[in-house]
Amino acid sequence: MNQQILRTTVDHLVVLASTLEEGARWCTHLLGVTPLPGGQHPLMGTHNRLVNISSFAYPDTYLEIIALDPEAISQRAPGLKRWFDMDDPVLHAQVVRDGPQLIHFVARCPDVLPAMQALGALGLDCGQVIKASRPTPEGLLQWRITVRDDGQRLLGGALPTLIQWGEPGEAEPAHPTQTLPYSGLQLQGLLLTNPTPELIESACEAIGLAGMQVQNGTPGIRATLQTERGLVQLSSPPH
């Protein structure tokens, strides 16, 4: 089990936008890159656009701009919330007022269950494992992802949602970066902040998530991206 846990790595950053069109404009203006079409998530009633941000330190990593799909309705059971706090009215109001925001990150592992158990041993409830998918021109992307019934991010987004791509035991599961071209953007660092930084450090160690900076502060994350215009920092809004 420890070998599986030690392979946990950053998979993607999550930027929430009020609409995908606004998210695309934000990305083009701030980062100098137009995000490519992603797809729809029928279970959650959301859709996305993607940008490759892979780097030497963070290989096979991308930025996801996500928004509610106006042409879809969440298929979650009554009372269950969408992922990434997307049903939180306070977060929604912040995004409407201030524009697209970095709100979270997702970490991948070959088996999501041991990582969930490791966090659970620290009193951190990841919720349930949900099987999800979306069609692409290259075929069906499939994954298993942790989602709480209340949709909340762990520690205000400072700890990742966990994802396992493909079917269990699949040797080379399909991943979005396999079809995302080089964008000129590279993830250089992630800073995780929380009033209890020792809990963040223990959680990262428990799931084998290396390369994170941890500081005492308001719950959230800050990502540093190398762009063709220089370094750009994205910070999550106050939680």
Descriptions of predicted regions:
Residues 20-32, 115-122, 196-207:
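Amphipathic alpha-helical segments
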Residues 15-19, 109-110, 190-196:
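Short, surface-exposed ligand-recognition loops at beta-strand->loop->(often short) alpha-helix junctions
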Residues 10, 102-104:
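Eukaryotic phosphotyrosine signaling hubs
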Residues 8, 97-99:
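Structural motif
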Residues 2-20, 28-33:
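Hydrophobic, proline/glycine-rich low-complexity stretches
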Residues 39, 50-67, 89-97, 104-185, ...:
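Vicinal oxygen chelate
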Residues 24-91:
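Glycine/small-residue-rich interface belts in oligomeric ring/scaffold proteins
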Residues 10, 14, 26-27, 89-92, ...:
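Proline/glycine-anchored alpha-helix kink/cap motifs
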